[in-house]
Design a protein with these regions (language model features):
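C-terminal beta-strand-rich structural cap/linker in extracellular carbohydrate-active enzymes
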Residues: 578-596
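Bacterial lipoprotein signal-peptidase II cleavage site
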Residues: 26-35
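Bacterial N-terminal signal peptides that target proteins for export
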Residues: 2-14
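Acidic/aromatic-lined carbohydrate-recognition and catalytic surfaces
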Residues: 81-273, 284, 291, 295-343
Length: 596
């Protein structure tokens, strides 16, 4: 690190320290005792989503004068050396390497009091996701939003579309959607829509008309000139696995998921013309791309056919908008989904690291970090052999998976939860965060439980709170709501904010060529060096539960032997900080260090 940067860091630290000592502001003043609130959140602090009675029992109020005096004294008593992360400017690049926030509109924020989240509710909370001001630290810092389906649909989840050109009335109108896009553009947020092309709803006019045609056909042979929509689906008179009987006829139709989701015939040129029009419609409106649902199901058990269709779709979308972003869901192991990169698609969700059985969770729970480090470093070869321009899409959970709060138990649970988040967010590519994961929301079992209302407050009657899916089980949240966590510097929420901020400060994290430093790493310390456009950043993950030391003699970054001056960010789960002295690195349990 050159002298100019070191001087800027020193000046920033001095200024920040003076500001903290002279003011009574700052996160976590009331939690200056160093206790991680998550240690108690699962006991006395654990609350039900409908326990409104508990929420009225707040602490007594004091006068403004008393509060100010106590706050000033508290700030003086708990003033700590400022974190350099707060003083380093962001380097957010307008490309397709982003941090996406997955939003289930139904459960996010209700603007009209009907218990269902809507687009106006999302618009009102955009500043929570990203306020568009790089100088603030009050937002999450995500610069992308993945909208789960918002098209009209008869189901709460809306993965069975009845109109690809409109917005579900429960969510709002096309004008609301256009307002959302404009508000996101002002904040530098790229919006991608869920595009469901494997199937439609059985209530879609295409299927309704095709069904009516077959019911009236009798024993005659179908003619697509009489009913073009017959060719939009797979119909047969022979019963087969994955096919459902069409009531009132002797015909069957393909419906691999369930009878209400008839599979589309993606070989139909007429249907492909419809798909091209649909993509153009939304891209012209300002959508930044699409999340492609169930891409491995397009052609059942045929990777070559799936890749061929994805190639056509990618070319179609890119011809309309060159910088559009496409990410596909191919729920397979790494050797399976990586083959889909041959289509030229930008990204595929990296299922190998996600979920309770994924590599991140296993590593955090005690497996050797060696496999994590070696696998991270090998991804470029694994994916690059199919598409040298690939962009990985790491995620930790999504709407189909149990939420990560349930993965960990015991006294280290909250620390492990945080560590896992960092290991996901510090991977290459476009990282994805499922709404509420930044709060440690619970949700497992049936799908409805995984899509519970965003936990803005303990008070279920608070403005904006959603009711959630009708068939969701009643269960208690494990950790505090946003109301509490936003006031606690050691909360899961604040940890996520800091991790995303570090990611946004160091573009090498998402874009760099990865080298696993096996000679220095060991079972509990994983060291990765990432190089992008001639600049290096070193990431050190310590997955041990207790504080640990590592000899880093010989470790360099940007051509210099590592010293404390090279620290440009760290993630700890409590008050103990990472430090370097005489080539010995000391890191608290479940911590991450960033060097540059």
């Amino acid at each position: 690190m050159d002298m100019a940067i070191r001087m800027k860091k020193a000046a920033a630290l001095i200024l920040a320290y003076c500001m903290i000592c002279l003011t009574a502001c700052g996160n976590g003043g009331a939690q200056g005792n160093g206790t991680d609130p998550a240690d108690t959140a699962g006991t006395a602090g654990e609350v039900g989503m409908d326990s409104a009675a508990e929420n009225t029992a707040e602490t007594g109020e004091s006068t403004d004068t008393d509060s100010a005096a106590e706050g000033a004294q508290e700030a003086s008593d708990t003033a700590q050396e400022p974190d350099i992360t707060d003083m380093i400017p962001l380097q957010v690049i307008d490309d397709n390497y982003r941090t996406y926030y997955e939003v289930f509109v139904y459960s996010f924020y209700d603007s009209d009091g009907d218990g269902i989240g809507d687009l106006q509710g999302l618009i009102s909370q955009l500043d929570y996701i990203n306020d568009g001001d790089d100088t603030t630290d009050t937002d999450l810092g995500c610069n992308g939003i993945w909208l789960m389906p918002v098209n009209p649909s008869p189901t709460y989840h809306k993965y069975d579309v009845t109109d690809y050109y409109d917005i579900d009335a429960a969510y709002g109108t096309l004008e609301d959607f256009k307002e959302l896009l404009a508000a996101c553009e002002e904040r530098g947020i790229k919006v991608i829509m869920d595009l469901v092309l494997n199937h439609s709803s059985s209530e879609h006019p295409w299927f309704v008309e095709a069904s009516s045609y077959l019911k009236a056909l009798g024993d005659d042979e179908p003619n697509i000139e009489d009913c073009p929509y017959f060719d939009y689906y797979h119909f047969t008179k022979e019963p087969a696995s994955g096919y459902e009987a069409l009531p009132g006829t002797d015909w069957y139709y393909e419906a691999r998921f369930w009878s209400g989701m008839p599979d589309l015939n993606l070989d139909s040129q007429a249907l492909r013309g419809e798909i091209e029009d649909i993509c153009k419609y939304w891209l012209d409106m300002g959508v930044g791309g699409f999340r492609l649902d169930a891409v491995k199901e397009y052609y059942t058990e045929s990777i070559p056919d799936n890749v061929a269709f994805l190639s056509w779709l990618t070319d179609t979308v890119k011809a309309e908008k060159e910088d559009a972003y496409l990410v596909g869901e191919a729920w397979l192991d790494i050797n399976g989904f990586s083959q889909y990169y041959a289509s030229g698609i930008d990204s595929l969700f990296n299922f190998s690291f996600a979920g309770a059985e994924g590599l991140i969770c296993k590593t955090v729970k005690g497996s050797s970090t060696v496999r994590y480090g070696e696998t991270i470093a090998s991804l470029d070869e694994t994916f690059g052999q199919y598409n040298e321009n690939y962009i990985d899409a790491p995620f930790y959970t999504n709407h189909d998976m149990a939420r990560s709060a349930g993965y960990y138990v015991g006294e280290d649970a909250v620390s492990q939860l945080k560590m896992a988040a960092a290991m996901n967010l510090f991977m290459n590519g476009s990282a994805f965060v499922y709404y509420g994961e930044e709060l440690g929301m619970k949700g497992s079992g049936k799908d409805e439980n995984k899509r519970a209302p965003m936990y803005w407050s303990k008070n279920a009657d608070m403005e904006g709170m959603c009711d959630g899916p009708a068939d969701m089980d009643a269960f208690e949240m494990k950790y505090e709501s946003l109301e509490e966590q936003s006031k606690d510097q050691y909360s899961i929420y604040c940890y996520y904010k800091k991790a995303i901020r570090i990611r946004n400060q160091n573009p090498e994290i998402a874009r760099g060529k990865v080298e696993y430093l096996s000679g220095i790493s060991n079972e509990r310390f994983c060291i990765l060096k990432k190089t992008w456009e001639g600049s290096e950043v070193v990431l050190i993950f310590h997955t041990g539960a207790e504080s640990g030391e590592l000899d880093i003699a010989g470790l360099t970054v940007n051509g210099e032997t590592v010293t404390p001056d090279h620290i440009c960010g760290s993630l700890e789960t409590g008050e103990e900080k990472c430090s370097i002295a005489d080539s010995v690195l000391t890191m608290p349990g479940y911590s991450v260090l960033v060097l540059k």
